[in-house]
Amino acid sequence: MATRRLTDAFLLLRNNSIQTRQLLAEQVSSHTTSSPLHSRSIAAELDELADDRMALVSGISLDPEAAIGVTKRSPPKWVDGVDEIQYDVGRIKQKMKELASLHDKHLNRPTLDDSSEEEHAIEITTQEVTQLFHRCQRAVQALPSRARRACSEQEERLLRNVVASLAQALQELSTSFRHAQSDYLKRMKNREERSQHFFDTPVPLMDDGDDATLYGQGFTDDQLVLVEQNTLMVEEREREIRQIVQSISDLNEIFRDLGAMIVEQGTVLDRIDYNVEQSCVKTEDGLKQLHKAEQYQKKNRKMLVIVILVAVIIVLLVALVAVKSR
């Protein structure tokens, strides 16, 4: 079943109404300081204008007779949660762009020395993105609990559509982030392989005497420093790879949870489609029954007319016989 996402339009209309009311309040306050009598009329006109605009936005008639039973209701509590989730989604997109630029800067650096500041920034940004994903996931799962207990069917349907839309958006973002992390991990491994190919030199075979002479001399200071630097580099690379793998595993958990939510929403939509189809079938059956009842009713009218005519004929015959007998 095709659905339309009306969340953005709803938020735009709500923000416009808030800005309009604030602007009208500022105008009323500025006119109040100038003249009290004139300010009352202006305030009344501005209130009427605001009511007209709100009526145009909401589609509610301002006719007193038509407005019977219409009450002003505050927006649902889960709308604030939707705003927070959309704000976090915007932050996730911004952080993902920053992380992509840090990855490119770290991997495409022309120098051969490693920058611990860049690696630390990559680690912090990755953790922030993962935390934002977890927060959005928990917020999306908590949206149905923030709905009113006695909410209408339209509000409940709107909430289900909003939850499905947010879950799908988060799933797409998590997939993109997971692909970016996997690509970064592959590029890291390729760089390590290229560095080993260019900098690892084969050791020539030596006799036992040369071997004893070499190890008898021991390592020089430069060789010890080089070995220590290589060890630190390998440990740093292993730590980065472990962090990337951990972030990917966390994203897999989020991906599974969001997939389960989307499956649940799809099941609800399928159930709604089934109910709509069943209602259409029952409506068609009811229409057929109405046609049959109409035909039966028409036949009953014909029989009633025939009975009345027969009764009239009998009465006339009796009257005719009575008249002739005299």
Swiss-Prot record:
Domain called t-SNARE coiled-coil homology: residue spans: 231-293
One Pfam family it belongs to: SNARE
Modified residues (Phosphoserine): S41, S74
Alphabetical UniProt keywords: Coiled coil, Golgi apparatus, Membrane, Phosphoprotein, Protein transport, Transmembrane, Transmembrane helix, Transport
GO cellular component terms, semicolon-separated: cytosol; Golgi apparatus; Golgi cisterna; Golgi membrane; perinuclear region of cytoplasm; SNARE complex; synaptic vesicle membrane; trans-Golgi network
Topology, Vesicular side: 324-326
Residue numbers on the Cytoplasmic membrane side: 1-302
Protein location: Golgi apparatus membrane
Transmembrane intervals: 303-323
Coiled-coil features, chain-numbered ranges: none
Keyword Cytoplasm attached: no
BP-aspect Gene Ontology terms: endocytic recycling; intracellular protein transport; retrograde transport, endosome to Golgi
GO molecular function, one term: syntaxin binding
Topology with respect to the bilayer: Single-pass type IV membrane protein
Function text: SNARE involved in vesicular transport from the late endosomes to the trans-Golgi network.
Assembly, per entry: Interacts with GCC2. Interacts with BAIAP3; this interaction is increased in the presence of calcium.
Homology family: Belongs to the syntaxin family.
Protein name: Syntaxin-16
UniProt organism field: Mus musculus
